[in-house]
Amino acid sequence: MLFRSIPVSFYEKDVNRLFNTVAVIDADGSNLGIYRKTHIPDDHYYQEKFYFVPGDTGFQVFDTAYGKIGVGICWDQWFPETARAMAVKGAELLFYPTAIGSEPILECDSMPHWRRAMQGHAAANLMPVIAANRIGTEEVVPCEENGGQRSALTFYGSSFITDQTGELVAEADRKTEQVILATFDLNEMQENRLSWGIFRDRRPECYGDICK
């Protein structure tokens, strides 16, 4: 028995296709299913389009022993549509396993922006967000495929948990592996979502332009 529910990221091969995938393992050890990453980045340091195809599962919500969770993967977290899609499917908590780091080409620290994007998802959907990011440095070794470039990407950790208003309630630092914890009353949060009326007052028939 695990006595906890865990999203587990892995690289999945399906015949001749590769996916960036997460499986959700429930407290009794059962596999509740998988989600395949929807948004695939293509950047100097995140060249996933060379390897992965876009996911075909659609956004998923998993009914775990401790509540209904939605899971997006890394680049998915920058799209508000990801969070809202999981929210309208009944998610009570949003999880984002992540591998993001310094932006040497842009010469900026994207960590605060990264956090604020997901704090906004929490506030807009009135549910906690849990983001787990890796630490450490990976070096790019010169080769023919990358034009002989040598570079390095330092992942900035800073994993965090927000409450349903987007306020940070737990956070890790940039350089060490840490376990962070928070406790939520799902019934209380559901009452809070209902009292705000955000989902009651949605007008999906007016949102067609964002799907173009």
Language model features: what each stretch is:
Residues 30-33, 167-169, 190:
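Short helix-loop capping/hinge motifs at secondary-structure junctions, enriched
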Residues 8, 21-24, 60, 159-161, ...:
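Short beta-strand scaffold segments in enzyme catalytic cores
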Residues 188-212:
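A conserved C-terminal secondary-structure "cap"
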Residues 13-98, 102-120, 195-196:
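Active-site catalytic loop in hydrolytic enzyme cores
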Residues 35, 62, 132, 172, ...:
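Hydrophobic residues at beta-strand termini and immediately following loops
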Residues 3-7, 68, 74-179:
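CN hydrolase (nitrilase-like) catalytic-core segments centered on the catalytic cysteine
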Residues 26, 186-188:
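Non-catalytic surface loops within mature trypsin-like serine protease
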